[in-house]
């Protein structure tokens, strides 16, 4: 590791306390072999401590956008900065420590609840684990298990419900104390009350955790500091919920279609 970096960049990169958490400057992404770009000319700034929503229809580019933040892919055009530095200056291992991604499909391993959470950080104390479980709205169901943290987990978490698995993977990400947490539709198996409690607990965490919430549900993003609205790889809206209802037809359409179904009530 570090072989592809100039010598002065190989050491641990100190977090630049002056920089914004994430900055996209005219970013486009075309996957190898694809004719059309998956993202075109995306620019936004996420300040430290903000919650950023990302919404759009299927295939609008939501997952492509957030895949650039942990550098699963590199932008084809434009630049991405993390904590005030160009993303390519970070050794990938350092970046993975700063950016935690929780996917919709929760990945759990055979073992115990504790051993799964310790993937987030091998040095975490039980107090750290319980704090992460509280924030992730998982403490209650873990406490209800006969063995608590030592409760067995089957490979893939087969002995847990979808919502329990998702909450444990969110807790595991929090154990690593990242600077940036990305929830990629990862609250989709949670009911509204739990989803709302999770968002509230994340917002109340001390420090400057920046949270990206990718969701199909407008209701999940109503309290975000900024919402990025994507349509066919382009950013068609950027603002808060109330602003976007006025200014962004794509957002308004998503919200109203869900509201009519009773989805957006809470």
Language-model segments: which ranges?
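ABC-type nucleotide-binding domain
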Residues: 5-266
């Amino acid at each position: 590791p570090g072989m592809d970096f100039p010598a002065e960049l190989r050491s641990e990169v100190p977090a630049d306390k002056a920089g914004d958490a994430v900055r996209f400057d005219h970013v486009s992404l075309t996957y190898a072999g694809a004719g059309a770009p998956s993202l075109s000319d995306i620019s936004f700034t996420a300040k430290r401590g903000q919650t950023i929503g990302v919404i759009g229809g299927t295939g609008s580019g939501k997952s492509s956008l957030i895949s650039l933040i942990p550098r699963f892919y590199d932008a084809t055009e434009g630049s991405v900065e993390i904590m005030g530095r160009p993303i390519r200056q970070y050794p990938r291992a350092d970046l993975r420590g700063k950016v935690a991604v929780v996917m919709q499909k929760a990945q759990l391993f055979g073992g115990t609840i504790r051993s799964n959470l310790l993937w987030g950080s091998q040095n975490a104390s039980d107090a750290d684990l319980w704090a992460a479980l509280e924030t992730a709205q998982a403490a209650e169901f873990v406490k209800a298990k006969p063995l608590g943290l030592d409760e067995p987990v089957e490979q893939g978490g087969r002995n847990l419900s979808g919502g329990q698995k998702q909450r444990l993977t969110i807790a595991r990400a929090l154990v690593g104390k990242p600077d940036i947490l990305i929830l990629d539709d990862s609250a989709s198996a949670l009911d509204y009350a739990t989803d709302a409690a999770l968002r509230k607990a994340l917002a109340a965490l001390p420090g400057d955790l920046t949270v990206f919430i990718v969701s199909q549900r407008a209701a999940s993003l109503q309290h975000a500091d900024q919402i990025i609205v994507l349509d066919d790889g382009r950013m068609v809206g950027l603002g808060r919920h109330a602003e976007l209802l006025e200014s962004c037809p794509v957002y308004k359409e998503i919200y109203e279609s869900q509201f009519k179904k009773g989805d957006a009530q809470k």
